[in-house]
Amino acid sequence: FSELVSLAYKERVQLSALGFYKTPNIHWDRAKGKGEPFYYFSYGAAVSEVSLDTLTGEYVLNRTDILHDVGQTLNESIDIGQIEGGFIQGVGWLTSEELFWDDCGRLKTHAPSTYKIPLASDTPETLNISLLQNSPNPRPTVKRSKAVGEPPFMLSISVFEALSMAASSVVDYSTCPNLSAPATPENLLLTIEKLKRQNDA
């Protein structure tokens, strides 16, 4: 092998190659709003339970149950880990990751000291994840699997909605609050106070 590499080097023959994957059968007509923009879809469902202190805006994520479609799993442990990671990343996006700029337009929340991402202690006390069974990808993918890196990110909306409904409890669920993301304790408390004022008016 070393002789072959040496000879290729001397003769200036490249021993590596580069290529790009092009997803087949996707197209989109922007003018008509029709087409097939994705090769396949991944589906998931999540239900989350929170406890919200309506006097402080602080909350605890008690429980989340997730069912996710990964097609035919290649490795159940890896798929579950990807779902956990995507979900918790999404929880951070919707509950703690806040962007602030100074008067000159410079980002102030640019480091771990100012940009708050979830910790291990922010995971739900109970986190149940199940993979949808008997649902191979109808497309001819590797062993009929589906990508599972990014799709679970959106399952965190269940936490945001649980917090929104918990805030609505102060007015006996009579209205759906206009809760802004991220649902920090401060934003939750402001939302709760606004709901109370509207209810008293």
Predicted segment positions?
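C-terminal catalytic domains of large/alpha subunits in multi-subunit enzymes
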Residues: F1-A201
